[in-house]
């Protein structure tokens, strides 16, 4: 209910007043607010306008703000929701602790979807009255910058005015940074002045200045990466104690890149490839342990591509760092510019933008994406360039494998959620072989096939096309069962091995029991071609899906005797490709 009210008000003309506060308050209703604040502060501290930077923290802010002030501010700013919030906040809230009932008469209610918005509106007038050249807040965390006298005066004003509405600064968590442009004697006086107002304020240096979890100066990046390597190593050791599929799934979607995305977008980590290399090597070692395979250099390069380009989706930090940073700057540049233009302090570009753009142009691509605000647009260009370089050096079976793996749907199994209950769990042996075939790495030792006696190399391709192997029949049955179940789930009953034959006496694989199109029943015959079979490599190394296309044309020709009585469809798949349909 509250979410609906909030969205309705914020999208109304009255919401314009609320959105105007985003210049100083980026803590609610602001897409990319944290990133914009970090980029703006990094730009500001590198300008001559920055003498000091003050980080403020409010103690227990949401639970302490005066409710009368909160409601009065709401009544003046957004009267449309005043009556609704009055019902929520005019009486003390009941908090339960075991069997005890505690009445809470101050602060926003715990779990209130409107909590961040109404808290920000409560302190909005105070924030706008400040005179510092840099003035940006994320809810109760404020950052002020400029000359020391103005920032100090704002600190005194905040301390006094916040006290009037029930808020108190937590000086133990407040931090003061003094620019290198300030001489040592002046710096000592500045520190003393701030200590008189905030006795326990911390004086920090470049290597410890962080904003909203992101380092501001380059000096703070190496310690952060060292800490991240240690933490990821601890996580990685635990992954080896669970199933391979679960471990790979967690690694791709929960660890490393997902945890690093915010930092990659906020910080110029791409400038330190020598520091990123240990993380990439740790990732490589971990995936080798999970899948029980060993990567060649080409296989590792392919594995770190997105799934849609033939990889495993386990991205390297060094590959994602620059696209993520460039996308963040372009997507938040307007907001960051508004934060900086709120004062006459800066008329410069966002810090590191030119350097990052030059680094991009110095790479394999000389073009910028048409949609620079989207990270995938940058990543697509880099990934396509990497895939093309792999294709340029690959020949024969390797090229056919790469083309097949980079086709749509061929890597959908890598998105499967590891759940035995839903039938999407992949056992360790199957996962190892599937990944090995996709990447072209050894999956077995050289030996002779137990079924036909043929030589089998370490890549294991023989098992995909062995005419004596048991897997060929089960694979064909599984294909037809999938088709039949798909039709039945769509309300089209179907049967396998119908009572119709072609001229040589052979039957198709299946048929619908009701008309499919223009009064005719659907008849299908499935086939699976080996992408890397010697007879198909000349065509599959030039065009993905060529083997399935050839087999489908053959099927259509064989069943042409059915004439117009049935709607015949050939269903062709490849061992390393997705499905094709030929009517």
Q: What do the PLM-derived regions correspond to, one by one?
A:
Residues 149-151, 156, 160, 168-207:
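Short, conserved micro-motifs composed of acidic
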């Amino acid at each position: 209910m509250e979410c609906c009210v909030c969205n309705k008000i914020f999208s109304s003309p009255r919401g314009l007043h609320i959105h105007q506060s985003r210049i100083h308050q980026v803590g609610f209703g602001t897409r990319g607010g944290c990133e914009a604040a970090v980029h703006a502060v990094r730009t500001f501290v590198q300008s001559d306008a920055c003498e000091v930077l003050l980080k403020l923290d409010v103690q227990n802010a949401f639970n302490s703000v005066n409710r009368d002030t909160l409601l009065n501010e709401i009544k003046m700013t957004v009267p449309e929701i005043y009556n609704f919030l009055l019902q929520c906040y005019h009486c003390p809230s009941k908090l339960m602790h075991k069997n005890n009932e505690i009445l809470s008469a101050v602060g926003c209610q715990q779990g209130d979807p409107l909590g961040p918005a109404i808290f920000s509106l409560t302190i909005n007038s105070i924030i706008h009255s400040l005179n510092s050249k840099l003035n940006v807040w994320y809810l109760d965390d404020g950052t002020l910058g400029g000359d020391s006298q103005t920032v100090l005066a704002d600190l005194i004003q905040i301390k006094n005015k916040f006290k009037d509405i029930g808020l108190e600064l937590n000086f133990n968590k407040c931090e003061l940074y003094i620019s290198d442009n300030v001489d040592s004697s002046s710096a000592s006086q500045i520190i003393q002045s701030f200590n008189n107002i905030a006795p326990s304020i911390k004086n920090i240096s470049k290597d410890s200045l962080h904003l909203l979890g992101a380092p501001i100066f380059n000096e703070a990046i190496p310690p952060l990466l060292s800490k991240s390597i240690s933490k990821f190593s601890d996580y990685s050791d635990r992954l080896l104690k669970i199933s391979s599929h679960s471990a790979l799934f967690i690694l791709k979607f929960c660890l490393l890149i997902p945890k690093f995305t915010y930092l990659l977008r906020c910080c110029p980590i791409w400038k330190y490839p020598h520091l990123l290399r240990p993380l990439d090597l740790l990732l490589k070692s971990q995936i080798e342990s999970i899948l029980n395979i060993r990567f060649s250099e080409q296989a590792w390069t392919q594995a770190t591509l997105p799934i849609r380009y033939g990889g495993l989706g386990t991205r390297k930090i060094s590959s994602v760092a620059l696209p993520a940073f460039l996308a963040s700057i372009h997507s938040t540049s307007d907001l960051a510019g508004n934060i900086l233009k709120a004062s006459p302090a800066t008329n410069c570009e966002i810090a590191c933008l030119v350097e990052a753009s030059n680094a991009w142009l110095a790479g394999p691509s000389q073009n910028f994406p048409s949609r620079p605000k989207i990270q995938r647009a940058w990543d697509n260009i880099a990934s396509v360039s990497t895939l093309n370089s792999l294709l340029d050096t690959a020949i024969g079976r390797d090229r056919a494998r790469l083309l097949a793996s980079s086709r749509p749907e061929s890597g959908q199994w890598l998105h499967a959620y590891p759940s035995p209950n839903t039938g999407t769990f992949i056992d360790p042996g199957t996962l190892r072989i599937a990944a090995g075939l996709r990447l072209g790495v050894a999956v077995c030792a050289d030996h002779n096939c137990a079924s036909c006696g043929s030589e089998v190399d370490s890549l294991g391709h023989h098992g995909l096309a062995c005419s004596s192997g048991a897997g060929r029949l089960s694979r064909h049955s599984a294909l037809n069962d999938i088709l039949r179940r798909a039709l039945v789930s769509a309300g089209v009953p179907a049967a396998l091995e119908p009572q119709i034959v072609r001229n040589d006496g052979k039957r198709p694989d299946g048929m619908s029991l009701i008309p499919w199109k223009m009064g005719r029943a659907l008849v299908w015959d499935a086939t699976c071609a080996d992408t890397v079979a010697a007879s198909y490599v000349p065509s599959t190394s030039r065009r993905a899906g060529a083997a399935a296309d050839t087999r489908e044309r053959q099927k259509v020709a064989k069943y042409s005797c059915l004439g117009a009585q049935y709607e015949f469809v050939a269903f062709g798949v490849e061992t390393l490709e997705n499905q094709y349909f030929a009517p």
